[in-house]
């Protein structure tokens, strides 16, 4: 079967969920003050931002964001009379609401064993190994689930004085190392993270989903995390559609932290890490306009929605970030070829109005646009992996573990 689309561009608006998933009662956030566990059944990232702050997103509105099936309509994103794109929402079947699980399922994997988390912090023997390798002590009081901004507020001044490492975790399967760039260089931080990655792989006794380098700068009371973040992920446990495309000789482009999330597996061309989401759009545009990129697949992650606004429960900042992205959509559409396909989605929720600071278990929105499509409509609710199954069918490779293609529905 000949390709329907010469190029497919997949953009993940990290954490931009669109309402509680059917199994949200099994996933929890913890009240920051009382530590009470509250399930995610009332979470609704886009819905609550639209209601509390309001959203002025004319381009997403025209594409059909307001037409995505919901129990109640978005307050400030009205339905389009004739949406310019196919739209729907997708449900996650994997047993997790973290970045890796979401992206890996989008690329066709079914993760039924959740990645281990460490709510009590990391074991002493692991910390001792890191100390021995790095030659630096670790601040034990930080070794627990912590907000990334709060942990540097609380321990940054001490790190500036002593040079000790700040190692902390979250509700996600991550080990994060915060390092002030005046005390610990990025190069040293990355080397430490690479070591930690090497001793926490599957079968090592303590498996960790991602090791994250978190450099920051500034003075006490005014610390700021920089764009030097690096994620050191496990390699996917099975072959994803991204890897299948790569092995079939189809060009694959990574923008933002996609390459990190898949540990580079399946990525042919890495457009680099984003300084911020607007820089991420710039990098996507640079990939799309490369003369040699005539056929293939680009995969973009825009992380600021999640990292800067979702975890910090910043409704205003989150809404503004969505509007900023909406303002860039005409540029993306303008450089699309007639047979390009653009898909805009998310990987989980992170309702900035919700209790706690963790991700929320939500449906993700899906917008599917091409200049060649004649009759866009609302598609049935599907699953995350339907995206990769569609990509796979378009490029004549086998789908991964799960997912059903909707390629034939696009006319």
Swiss-Prot record:
Signal peptide: none
Bound cofactor: record note: Binds 2 manganese ions.
Pathway connected to this protein: Carbohydrate degradation; 2-deoxy-D-ribose 1-phosphate degradation; D-glyceraldehyde 3-phosphate and acetaldehyde from 2-deoxy-alpha-D-ribose 1-phosphate: step 1/2
Reactions the enzyme catalyzes: 2-deoxy-alpha-D-ribose 1-phosphate = 2-deoxy-D-ribose 5-phosphate; alpha-D-ribose 1-phosphate = D-ribose 5-phosphate
Protein localization: Cytoplasm
Cofactor (UniProt): Mn(2+)
Molecular function terms from GO: magnesium ion binding; manganese ion binding; phosphopentomutase activity
Main localization of the protein described in the UniProt heading: cytoplasm
Enzyme Commission numbers on file: 5.4.2.7
InterPro entries in the record: Alkaline_phosphatase_core_sf (IPR017850), DeoB (IPR010045), Metalloenzyme (IPR006124), Phosphopentomutase_DeoB_cap_sf (IPR024052)
Gene Ontology cellular component terms for the protein in this record: cytosol
Keyword Nucleus listed: no
UniProt: Mn(2+) 2 binding residues: 306, 311, 359
UniProt-listed GO biological process terms: 2-deoxyribose 1-phosphate catabolic process; 5-phosphoribose 1-diphosphate biosynthetic process; metabolic compound salvage; nucleotide metabolic process
Keywords: Cytoplasm, Isomerase, Manganese, Metal-binding
Cytoplasm in keyword set: yes
Binding site for Mn(2+) 1: 14, 347-348
Role this protein plays: Isomerase that catalyzes the conversion of deoxy-ribose 1-phosphate (dRib-1-P) and ribose 1-phosphate (Rib-1-P) to deoxy-ribose 5-phosphate (dRib-5-P) and ribose 5-phosphate (Rib-5-P), respectively.
Family note: Belongs to the phosphopentomutase family.
Entry-linked PANTHER family: PHOSPHOPENTOMUTASE
Protein name: Phosphopentomutase
Organism of derivation: Lactococcus lactis subsp. lactis (strain IL1403) (Streptococcus lactis)
């Amino acid at each position: 079967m000949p390709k329907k689309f010469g190029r497919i561009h997949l953009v993940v608006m990290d954490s931009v969920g669109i309402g509680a998933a059917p199994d949200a009662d099994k996933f929890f956030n913890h009240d920051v003050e009382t530590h009470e566990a509250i399930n995610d059944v009332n979470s609704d990232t886009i819905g609550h931002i639209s209601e509390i702050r309001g959203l002025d997103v004319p381009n997403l509105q025209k594409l059909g964001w307001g037409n995505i099936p919901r129990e109640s309509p978005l307050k400030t994103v009205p339905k389009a009379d004739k949406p310019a794109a196919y739209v729907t929402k997708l449900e996650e079947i994997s047993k997790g609401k973290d970045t890796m699980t979401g992206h890996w399922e989008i690329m066709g994997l079914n993760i039924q064993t959740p990645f281990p988390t460490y709510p009590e912090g990391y074991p002493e023997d692991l910390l001792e190994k890191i100390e021995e390798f790095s030659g630096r002590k670790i601040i034990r009081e930080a070794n627990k689930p912590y907000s990334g901004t709060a942990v540097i507020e609380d321990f940054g001044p001490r790190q500036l004085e002593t040079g000790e490492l700040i190692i902390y975790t979250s509700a996600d399967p991550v080990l994060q190392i915060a390092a002030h760039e005046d005390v610990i260089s990025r190069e040293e931080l990355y080397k430490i993270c690479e070591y930690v990655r090497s001793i926490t792989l599957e079968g090592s006794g303590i498996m960790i989903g991602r090791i994250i380098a978190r450099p920051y700068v500034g003075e006490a009371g005014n610390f700021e995390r920089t764009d030097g973040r690096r994620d050191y992920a496990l390699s996917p446990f099975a072959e994803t559609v991204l890897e299948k495309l790569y092995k079939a000789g189809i060009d694959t482009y990574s923008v933002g932290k996609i390459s990190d999330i898949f540990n580079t597996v399946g990525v042919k061309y890495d457009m680099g890490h984003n300084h911020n989401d607007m820089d991420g759009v710039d990098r996507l545009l640079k990939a799309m306009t490369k003369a040699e990129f005539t056929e293939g697949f680009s995969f973009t992650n825009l992380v600021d929605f999640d990292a800067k606004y979702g975890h910090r429960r910043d409704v205003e900042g989150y809404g503004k970030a969505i509007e900023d992205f909406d303002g860039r959509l005409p540029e993306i559409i303008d450089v699309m070829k007639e047979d390009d396909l653009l898909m805009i989605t998310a990987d989980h929720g992170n309702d900035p109005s919700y209790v706690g600071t963790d991700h929320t278990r939500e449906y993700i929105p899906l917008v599917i646009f091409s200049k060649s499509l004649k009759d866009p409509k609302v598609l049935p609710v599907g699953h995350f992996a339907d995206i990769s199954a569609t990509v796979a069918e378009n490029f004549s490779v086998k789908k991964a573990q799960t997912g059903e293609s909707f390629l034939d529905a696009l006319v």
